[in-house]
Amino acid sequence: VRRDQTSQDLNNLYGLARRARSKLEPSWYLNLAFYGNEQWLAWDGRQLFRPPVPRTKVTLVDNRIQPIIRKEIARMSKMRPVFTVTPNSADQEDTNAAVLGEELMRYLWKHLDMQRHRMNALLWSRICGAGFLKCFWDPSIGPKRTLVLKPDGDLLAAANGRAVNAGSPEHMLADSMAPGSLTTKSVAQGDVRVEVRSPFQMFIDPLCDNFAEAEWLIEESVKSEDYVYQRYGVTVAADTPANPGLVEARMGGAFTLLPGRTAYMGVRLREYWCKPNREHPQGCRQVWVTTTSTKGKVDSQILERDDAPFDPMPYVMFAGIPMPGRLMPMAVVDALRGPQTELNKVESQLAENRNRLGNPTLLMSRQAVQNAEQFAEQIGRVGGIYWYDDVGSPNAKPDVLPAPSLPEYVTDQIPLITQSMQEISGQHEVSSAQVPPGVTAASAINLLMEADDTMIAPDVADHEEELGKLGCKLLELVSHYYTTARTIQI
């Protein structure tokens, strides 16, 4: 039986899930670095680092990965999804409810800024193999009302069952009957909320082969002290540095703060979600915070527990390239990093050879050139003149040492690497509105475009299926929590 009753039990589950995915994290960090134009990095087992190279060495970056990812996201999200709600029966009431559901989804798509969340989740799935959307009810957002509380702390209700607003006739009447016994409280209306989660924040059941089979998961995030106090009513000391960026946070000494400066700190918040099981017939949700003292002692405190959450698994996952027998898919960047590294090396070698031709090595006689510093200064000027002594030796005159030319097979590597990256990504010339050499027939061009689109078809199908699941979750939340009249714009 899985133990999840105490904060220590939850921390143990967190450790198990973290160790299960530890071998994938280095690849995620490298993928992010390559996408962000940091492509001369390596992983030393703990963090990213730049291998030491001479200052004169050219480290050119010709980032072909970023446009590939952006094109793939554009191909998958160029059309706004259309949600279709099917009525349960042919009754007019069910038909009207289905029409209302479709109108409501159009409203929620704009109201919740779903396009931006969708793009961010897709970006994570293309770079790291998985991106998540979390759909839940947030009682702290929306317009606020001042309600009346009875002496026992419950809301004062009117005859129709609705809560009484402060200052209303019902409030005045109840207060006159029991002067001074009533209090008021500001309560938000609440609303549906959608947030993006990266694979770095998700610690999923290690026994599952796909996300739908996950029995539990833990989400980790860093929040401000005020956020924790507003949501859970407790004050927790911040001890976790704010994240400057996932790649930058793993760069070690290159991004260390200067002496005398302190980082902006936050609170490490963890959230446990569990599907129904023997211990939790209706599922379970727990929120706890983990702090570390100055002596290195780790303390944990459970802030909230819900033994009957409305949705015990409020996440959908956008997947990359499926890997048999593994929960986390791989990303196309994993396969592109090798060719991208070789492309950078070849182009850096060409740049170094170009620099040698523009600033060649000179041969000069020590007897003919009396002042070496003055000679070096003159040859660096345009049209500079330097007088040398003709000592009668054939080697007295300074001469240029010709730089060796690169073999043809080095320059031939660039088109080969480019073709390899096109095959890996499924983005050939036709995907970039370019006609391949020798192809003139319209039917042939259409076949090539169809071949590129076919390669991405499984990803598009998975994306549409997950969007459908998200739509169902949104409508279920609205049906359960929209208990008061609201105005929506269609």
What are these regions (language model features)?
Residues 127-131, 386-387, 434-450:
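Core structural elements
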Residues 37, 42-48, 152, 364-380, ...:
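Charge-rich, acidic-biased intrinsically disordered regions
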Residues 139, 408, 443-490:
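Extended amphipathic alpha-helical segments with heptad-repeat/coiled-coil character used for oligomerization
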Residues 1-305, 358, 374, 402, ...:
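Extended, helix-rich architectural segments
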Residues 98, 114, 126, 336-339, ...:
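Active-site-proximal structural scaffolding
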Residues 83-88, 116-124, 135-138, 353-366, ...:
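Short coil/turn segments at secondary-structure boundaries
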Residues 257, 263-266, 270-438:
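Extended, charged amphipathic alpha-helical segments
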Residues 108, 112-116, 135-141, 206, ...:
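A generic secondary-structure signal for well-formed alpha-helical elements
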